[in-house]
Amino acid sequence: MEIPKEFLDRMRAILQEEGEWQSFLHSFSEMAKRGIRVNRKKVEEAEKEGFSFREWKEKWHLEPVFSEEREEEQREFYVEEEELRESGISIGKDPYHEGGLYYIQDPSAMAVVPRMEIRPFDRCLDLCASPGGKSLQIADLLSEEEGGILLSNEYVGERARILSQNAERMGYCNLAVVNETPASLAENFPSYFSRILVDAPCSGEGMFRKSEEAVKDWSPLLVEKCAERQRDILESAFRMLREGGELCYSTCTF
């Protein structure tokens, strides 16, 4: 993998602390961490039919991402994909995955929603939602009885379809998927949401380890275009935030 020189020069200027630069370069030769997020509602249903979550957890050697949580609250786990593959298990094709018992998600992506402090009654918006991992995390924290709702938006039509499929597979009924521009939503939902997530589309530098296409597509111009688009999205998001609400901005790169 040949990383763009402009990108490396920029990162070298940022990473000035001792050892940071070498650690950063070394990270490109490491395997990316993989994770799954367990659907506790589906697990509880399966346990009534004889399924044992504890046995499954031990068989797959699942380790919690957030170790400070109590065992009964743990949903996010690291998974050793290569080890499972050697045992004949493909986490993307396993029946438990098809049945919605878990969702495959990068561990770093799991850290965003807990920062939002979602309450059961919140009106939530995930403005750039596909493929849906963070939307599903939010939906898991809302209560239909207390009026909690989630609007999951994805502007790209094909990605919106994937988002809908994932929500259906995981069995969540307290979210609605829409396919709109942020500006259009802002016209229809002024000062409406108490929690908004903008997981903004970015220049894809976090995908360099996984995708040669991401490396080929990168350029300083792409970074500038992404930054401009993110500003436009954030402006629309702010118009939809009710007084006293919270807006969470996250992105893997700029």
Where are these regions (language model features)?
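S-adenosylmethionine
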Residues: 1-254
